[in-house]
Amino acid sequence: MAKQARAVQTWRSIVDAAASVFDDYGYERAAISEILRRAKVTKGALYFHFASKEAIAQAIMDEQTSTVEFEQEGSPLQSLVDGGQQFAFALRHNSMARAGTRLSIEGVFLGGPHPWGDWIDATARMLELGQERGEVFPQIDPMVSAKIIVASFTGIQLVSEADSGRADLRGQVAEMWRHILPSIAHPGVIAHIKPEGRVDLAAQAREKAEREEQEARIAAEAKGAGSDAATDSGSRSGGSGLRGGGSGRGPRAGGAGDEGDEEPAGAGVAAGGVVA
């Protein structure tokens, strides 16, 4: 259990550090050495979890698509507005959201699925739900409108970044909705939509930070419990720490590929177990 908690904590450290590096430098200029420095992990630990820089970037992209969740209950259009405002807030305060957006704009994954596809599909589904519930005009094409909405948001956040470091992004997103809503929704519905969003995003962010802090504390406690158990076991066996070939290092819990290795599995070790 302690080893598993450590692995999760290491994975999290690598992804968070990589997000800040990609946010600062973009994909091409991001260096593995800088990710290692910010994550405070070894090269072996990084390659235990990720085969390449692209794999790390993909993990960030996957996290970005989970940043916003659209509520299925209530007004589909208000849920779309709230989701957009939630992501605008994340772009201001969350390096993971900024890194994922920058990677998408840079077109890092041109060989795979388009990075905007999940956003467009999710938006189209909410517009379809809006049609079913009588909020959205029946004659509009949800997919076409979804592409316009996602493209508009993308352009607005780029301009906001250049103008104010995204300080005015939420206000600009509200203006975007004031322009788009009349073309897709009934006037009676628009009167009840709040373009600024209806969620206290600051309170929501505080709650999320508290949850993450609690999870990190639990993981650290589990790691400490595992270390205590290992110490007790070593004391009962004589405490020499010399096993196998008597190297003084002892076998790693996960074998040659354990995340604590200084290099990827097998690197630096010659035949017979002698360090090269």
UniProtKB/Swiss-Prot annotation:
Phenotype when changing G171E: In strain: IFO 13350
Keyword Zinc attached: no
SUPFAM superfamilies cross-referenced by the UniProt entry: Homeodomain-like, Tetracyclin repressor-like, C-terminal domain
Major place of residence: cytoplasm
Phenotype when changing V274I: In strain: IFO 13350
Domain of life: Bacteria
Example of a GO MF term: DNA-binding transcription factor activity
DNA-binding region: 31-50
Gene Ontology CC terms: cytoplasm
Region annotation (Disordered) ranges: 207-276
InterPro entries listed in its UniProt record: ArpA-like, CprB_TetR_C, Homeodomain-like_sf, HTH-type_TetR-like_transc_reg, HTH_TetR, Tet_transcr_reg_TetR-rel_C_sf
Annotated compartments: Cytoplasm
BP term (GO), one: negative regulation of DNA-templated transcription
Keywords: Cytoplasm, DNA-binding, Repressor, Sporulation, Transcription, Transcription regulation
Ranges of compositional bias, category Basic and acidic residues: 207-220
HTH tetR-type domain boundaries: 8-68
Bias-annotated ranges (Gly residues): 236-257
Compositional bias of kind Low complexity: 221-235
Keyword Cell membrane: no
Role played: Represses adpA expression by binding to the promoter region in the absence of A-factor, causing repression of streptomycin production and of sporulation.
Record's comment describing the protein's domains: Binds DNA through its N-terminal H-T-H motif and binds A-factor via its C-terminal region.
Complex and partners: Homodimer or multimer. Binds to both DNA and A-factor as a homodimer.
Identification of the protein by name: A-factor receptor protein
Lineage: Bacteria, Bacillati, Actinomycetota, Actinomycetes, Kitasatosporales
Underlying gene: arpA
